Design a protein with these regions (language model features):
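Alpha/beta-hydrolase superfamily serine-hydrolase fold, recognizing
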Residues: 3-210
């Protein structure tokens, strides 16, 4: 099994769609060099964490999606629109006991209060906020996606957009499995050795891409 890590360009030096274009180009390169690497060009998987999760989904939505048998967003940042503009986002949709609520709100606000800043840093044009290649949640054509494994963290700001995207996939009869790690926050995938959930997440991904 061959693994490749994509060193895509980063904003603000290289705003949207630079990172997306880089990821697509790598998929195309792997397909065109499949014989050299002894891989099946129609049996590729793509995964990413946070912004990388959104890029993975965007690739699945694009013309290279036909080569991707599995797309794995790990708490993907699937919507870069400002929270104040979102009718689906609400603190009350996070189930938490009252004495812990202030801690959860503090964690959620790390991204909720940054969304306008993220738009300014990531996008060339604010009108791209709902471009499906920047915010996959707003995609209307899901036909290039064949299978999705969605990893969620219970107290992640982006969880609600992930939940909504999963519903869109199910409504379109696209296979989508959601694994939500209870009690976890955005970034838990980096805590191998500290969180058992991280180890379980890695094993689940390995099981799905075999």
């Amino acid at each position: 099994m061959l693994f490749r890590s994509i060193d895509y360009r980063l904003a603000p030096e290289a705003p949207f769609p630079a990172a997306f274009d880089d990821c697509k180009d790598v998929v195309k390169w792997l397909v065109h060099h499949a014989d050299h690497w002894n891989i099946d060009p129609n049996n590729l998987s793509i995964a990413g964490e946070s912004a990388g999760g959104a890029l993975a989904v965007s690739c699945g939505l694009s013309e290279v999606g036909k080569y991707l048998k599995l797309v794995i967003p790990i708490y993907g940042a699937l919507d870069v629109c400002s929270a104040s503009d979102l009718d689906y986002w609400d603190y009350d949709l996070y189930d938490v006991i009252p004495e812990h609520k202030k801690y959860v709100i503090t964690r959620l606000n790390r991204f909720r209060n940054l969304n306008g800043t993220l738009q300014n840093l990531y996008l060339n044009d604010i009108s791209d906020a709902k471009n499906p290649m920047a915010s996959p949640l707003y995609a209307t054509d899901l036909s290039n996606l064949s299978n999705v494994l969605m990893i969620e963290a219970e107290y992640d700001y982006f969880r609600l957009s992930n939940d909504l995207f999963a519903e869109h996939l199910w409504n379109a009869d696209i296979p989508c499995e959601v694994i939500r790690y209870q009690g976890m926050d955005h970034g838990f995938y980096d805590r191998l050795g500290y969180c058992e959930q991280t180890k379980d997440c890695i094993l689940e991904i390995a099981k799905h891409i075999k």
